[in-house]
Amino acid sequence: MSEDRDLLAVGHTAFDYIIHLDEFPEPNTSTAIKRMRNLHGGAAANVALVGSRLGLRTSLVSAVGGDFEGSEYRELLESSGIDIESMILVADESTPTAFVMTDSDHNQISYFYWGAARYFKDAETPADAIKSARAVHLATGDPSFNCRCGEFARSLGKIISFDPGQDLHMYSRSQLERAVGVCDILFGNHHEIDRICSKLSVDIHGLREMGPGVVVKTYGKEGSIIYSDDVIKIDAIPREAVDPTGAGDSYRAGFMRAYLRGADLKTCGRFASAVASFIVEDEGTQTNIPDTGEAVKRFTAQWGYEPPI
């Protein structure tokens, strides 16, 4: 089967409730919601959609409920050129739903209803979708399903990136070893990468020895650090942040866009930072996605040269 897709994203497609508060309430208390919006999200869908807007041919494997059929969200993904033929439909379940709370300091707490995603673990490995992609991104989702997808992709020599995100706590040590062991690029925020190292009893050097030649550790507005044979510090592009939700997923999509075009790691990180800087300027994960030209323009304004991508 020919590789007619650049990037397959595996993991959650979700309906998001983005909720803003002044501060998180203590147990047994309440607090006022300043504003709330019902938007589209899910880490895998975010990566697929941002990647598509950046010119990648993307595909998506998620478990969705009957409410996804005929929805505006399905229409959006299809009209964006994303291949969703391998989506797992659980007709009598609801599509996963995220409730993302953000305080005035942009700290976040998320509550996630798995719904149809509970059926990931029993689903068949999406062999055709993996075969048809040059690279596979394992996003938040069921650990056993992600491990199976990663191992099948590795057997075919695919490029694999892995970002367990907020589902990291669901991985056993054995599952984490399997997923880390098959990936080329490991993404995580600094809390997550530190937890992964702790869970596997390794430092960054030991983590890279387990599989990923590249480990990307993000720090929000403080930027990111790329660990490979070198250690590369990437600055975040200063913007007026409205909502940080989805910035990490867009960073990963931007990074993979540059990486799959053969860019060096510093350019990958800088392009990722440029893409993410758009997402924080509006509420939600998919409301302010740049195209390649817009991201390149912001990259050039920040770093003084046009990226060779």
Swiss-Prot record:
Return the annotated site residues (Transition state stabilizer): R252
Q: Which cofactor does it need?
A: Mg(2+)
Q: Where does substrate bind?
A: D16, G42, N46, S110, Y111, F112, Q166, D249
Residues that hold ATP according to the record = Q108, N189, K217, T218, Y219, G220, K221, E222, G223
Keyword annotations of the record: ATP-binding, Kinase, Nucleotide-binding, Transferase
Q: What class of enzyme is it?
A: transferase
The portions of this protein that span the membrane are none
Its biological function?
Catalyzes the phosphorylation of a wide range of nucleosides to yield nucleoside monophosphates, using ATP, ITP or GTP as phosphate donor.
- Family that this chain belongs to: Belongs to the carbohydrate kinase PfkB family.
**Entry protein name:** Nucleoside kinase
Source organism per entry reads Methanothermobacter thermautotrophicus (strain ATCC 29096 / DSM 1053 / JCM 10044 / NBRC 100330 / Delta H)
- Lineage, please? Archaea, Methanobacteriati, Methanobacteriota, Methanomada group, Methanobacteria
